[in-house]
Regions:
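Membrane-embedded beta-strand positions of outer-membrane beta-barrel proteins
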Residues: 96, 194-198
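Outer-membrane beta-barrel "beta-signal"
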Residues: 200-211
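Outer-membrane beta-barrel proteins
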Residues: 67-70, 141, 185, 189-194, ...
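Bacterial N-terminal signal peptides that target proteins for export
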Residues: 2-13, 49-53
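N-terminal signal peptide c-region/cleavage motif recognized by signal peptidases
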Residues: 20-24
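Hydrophobic alpha-helical bundle signature of multipass membrane enzymes
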Residues: 26-123, 127-163
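Outer-membrane beta-barrel architecture
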Residues: 132, 136, 182, 206-208
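Alpha-helical transmembrane segments that form the membrane-embedded catalytic/substrate-binding core
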Residues: 126-130, 168-188
Length: 211
């Protein structure tokens, strides 16, 4: 198992900031002073259907890998930690959305509209989920397989895409990334996957060993 250094959260944050800096580096409003509405663009790689492909594709691949590999290998353990991570991030993001009630840029040009009934812009649940999925893998393999950092491109893409379709403000996607990364760090450092501990033993063995 890779050494768990305290530098991992910092490195993850730096990597996303580098990727998103050109996109968010503009004066605006909101809690960080960077929120501003982008011109609507639902075309090309930014199409909503492509966003869904990344989101649900990553989730399906993650769950499929966990079920197939079980908990007996390094990769399988990381997959189950990732499942824990995405569940925690998804539940927390949904609770925060309901609590903060922030209007989306598609509904208002004012990023300071909070606590509105039915509004759920903050934080970005999709960025949180994708970040939560990849973080355990990045933490586990970052030292012996540095290319794993390339997975950070997935939440970076989704963050930009969500802003382009006016679904989120800049601070929404940054908060989503922070939430997902924190969930992933918790799941990976905990060691034993929570969800796996309440499932029948066959899930820990994995389908590849069960047939």
């Amino acid at each position: 198992m890779a050494e768990r250094g305290s530098s991992a959260p910092t490195a993850a944050a730096i990597s996303l900031c580098v990727l998103l800096a050109p996109a968010i580096a503009q004066a605006g409003s909101g809690p960080l002073g960077i929120d501003h509405r982008w011109n609507y663009d639902n075309s090309g790689i930014w199409k909503r259907s492509n966003q869904d492909l990344v989101r649900y594709g990553a989730l399906a691949a993650d769950i499929g890998l966990a079920l197939w590999a079980g908990d007996g290998t390094r990769l399988g353990r990381s997959a189950w930690q990732s499942v824990d991570s995405v569940v925690l991030a998804g539940v927390t993001a949904e609770a925060a959305k309901r609590a903060f009630g922030r209007e989306r840029p598609g509904d208002s040009n004012d990023p300071n509209q909070w606590f509105k009934s039915g509004e759920r812009s903050f934080p970005s649940g999709e960025v949180a989920e994708i970040s939560a999925i990849i973080t355990p893998y990045v933490l586990e393999y970052r030292q012996d397989h540095p290319a794993v950092w390339g997975l950070e491109l997935l939440p970076a893409y989704d963050a930009i895409a969500r802003m382009k379709v006016q679904a989120h403000w800049q601070s929404d996607v940054l908060a989503g990334f922070a939430l997902g990364t924190a969930s992933g760090i918790w799941a990976q450092q905990r060691g034993t996957p929570v969800i796996l501990s309440v499932l029948p033993h066959g899930f820990a063995v994995g389908f590849k060993h069960g047939f």
